[in-house]
């Protein structure tokens, strides 16, 4: 019964939040498809590279701070969304922090799959996902059985799998379009800004939480902290 409860808590709470950000970033992949298809038909690599670069930059600008925010504010976010389910929340705090980092890689890989299909290589996306799934399954078998790791092993295996999938999907897209990604603009700058954003958000949350005599609603504190962090980011 206990293993079922732990796994149910993980899939019902942490995995639910984990799937939100990629749903948003997937739209960027779809939005670029018409112009990408046109560029492919004209064999206009410059237009393809320009569109892909913009897509990767916008996706990173959204995915990196969102993922890091989930990682550092996992407990407040769980309480905000699933208040009253205390035992389940306690089970999911650490796994969701790990999944927060995994969100970044999944969110970046998701639109890349749509692009691979447009470029006429859907089998590459399937192969990459299958390989990532095998890695995840293998690590799940090893890690979840360790008592000290437990259900966090599922989150760790997801993180490793998503890193692998993201690297290969981005590499495939870049290779097929001869794109040399602007690492600084796509990854370094958003990551630095996201770190500042996350630090600001967690400090704001801890400060407001300690001011117990104000009796501030915890949902308001969470929203306010996210808002302050977002202001710092943008």
Enumerate the predicted regions with their spans:
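Alpha-helical transmembrane segments of polytopic membrane transporters and translocases
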Residues: 5-25, 56-61
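Residue-level recognition of transmembrane alpha-helices
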Residues: 12, 59, 96-99, 103, ...
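Helix-loop junctions and terminal segments of transmembrane helices
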Residues: 25-42, 52
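Short alpha-helical transmembrane segments in multi-pass integral membrane proteins
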Residues: 51-74, 80, 151-177, 191-192
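Interfacial segments at transmembrane-helix termini and the short loops linking adjacent helices
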Residues: 71-103, 213
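Membrane-interface junctions at transmembrane-helix termini in multi-pass inner-membrane proteins
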Residues: 101-131, 141
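Membrane-interface helix-loop junctions in multi-pass transport and translocation proteins
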Residues: 123, 133-167, 181, 203-227
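C-terminal transmembrane helix end/exit motif
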Residues: 159-210, 232-234
């Amino acid at each position: 019964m206990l293993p079922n409860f732990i796994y149910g808590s993980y899939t019902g709470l942490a995995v639910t939040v984990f799937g939100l950000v990629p749903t948003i970033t997937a739209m960027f992949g779809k939005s670029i498809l018409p112009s990408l298809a046109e560029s492919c038909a004209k064999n206009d690599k410059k237009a393809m590279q320009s569109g892909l670069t913009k897509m990767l930059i916008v996706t990173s600008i959204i995915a990196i701070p969102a993922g890091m925010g989930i990682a550092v504010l996992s407990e407040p976010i769980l309480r905000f969304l699933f208040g009253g389910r205390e035992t389940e929340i306690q089970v999911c705090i650490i796994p969701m922090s790990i999944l927060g980092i995994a969100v970044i890689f999944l969110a970046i890989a998701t639109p890349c799959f749509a692009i691979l299909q447009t470029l006429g290589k859907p089998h590459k996306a399937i192969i990459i996902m299958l390989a990532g799934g095998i890695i995840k399954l293998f690590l799940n078998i090893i890690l979840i059985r360790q008592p000290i790791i437990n259900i966090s092993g599922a989150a760790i295996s997801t993180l490793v799998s998503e890193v692998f999938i993201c690297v290969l999907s981005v590499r495939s897209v870049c290779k097929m379009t001869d794109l040399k990604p602007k690492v600084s603009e796509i990854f370094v700058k958003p990551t630095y800004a996201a770190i500042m954003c996350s630090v600001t958000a967690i400090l704001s949350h801890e400060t407001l939480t300690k001011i117990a005599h104000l009796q501030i609603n915890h949902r308001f504190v969470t929203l306010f902290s996210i808002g302050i962090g977002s202001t710092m980011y943008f």
